[in-house]
Curated annotation (Swiss-Prot):
Residues 11-143 form the ADF-H domain. GO terms for molecular function: actin binding. GO terms for biological process: actin filament depolymerization. Belongs to the actin-binding proteins ADF family. It comes from Vitis vinifera. SUPFAM superfamilies: Actin depolymerizing proteins. Keywords: Actin-binding. Actin-depolymerizing protein. Severs actin filaments (F-actin) and binds to actin monomers. PROSITE patterns: ADF_H. This is Actin-depolymerizing factor. PANTHER family: COFILIN-RELATED.
Length: 143
């Protein structure tokens, strides 16, 4: 990894694969969602799981760990009141109450650095339990 990719004051570096996978979601619509985790050995944010374009929001939510932090992007498709098909990309910082304090701190201190790498995100959600990021929350934010 390049020296430029790591900056102690702003959290973990970001793996090129993570950036490229986000671009696949944004430009090519290859993924419905991408879940990222921090690899402490590599000191960077890496892709943990992707969901295909046909996967549902429930499948995405179920893929997030119950007791550990993650970052995720979700490509939310919806129809406006004018009957136009739209898509908005959500960045979700998942930090469940039951996760370890160390993990919460690590993800909190690395979030801004990682988030800046994801050009094209429309909305950001910080969630500590599933109700803070359910489909209704996304709908309200997107409209």
């Amino acid at each position: 990894m390049s020296f430029r990719g790591l900056n102690a004051s702003s959290g973990m570096g970001v793996a090129d694969h993570s950036k490229n996978t986000f671009l696949e979601l944004k430009r090519k619509k290859v993924h419905r969602y991408v879940i990222f985790k921090i690899d402490e050995k590599k000191k960077e944010v890496v892709v943990e799981k992707t969901g295909g374009p046909a996967e549902s929001f429930d499948e995405f939510a179920a893929a997030l760990p119950e007791n550990d932090c993650r970052y995720a992007v979700y490509d939310f498709d919806f129809v406006t009141s004018e009957n136009c098909q739209k898509s908005k990309i959500f960045f979700i910082a998942w930090s469940p109450d039951s996760s370890r304090i160390r993990a919460k701190m690590l993800y909190a201190t690395s979030k801004e650095r990682f988030r800046r790498e994801l050009d094209g995100v429309h909305y950001e959600i910080q969630a500590t339990d599933p109700t803070e990021m359910d489909l209704e929350v996304l709908r309200e934010r997107a409209h």
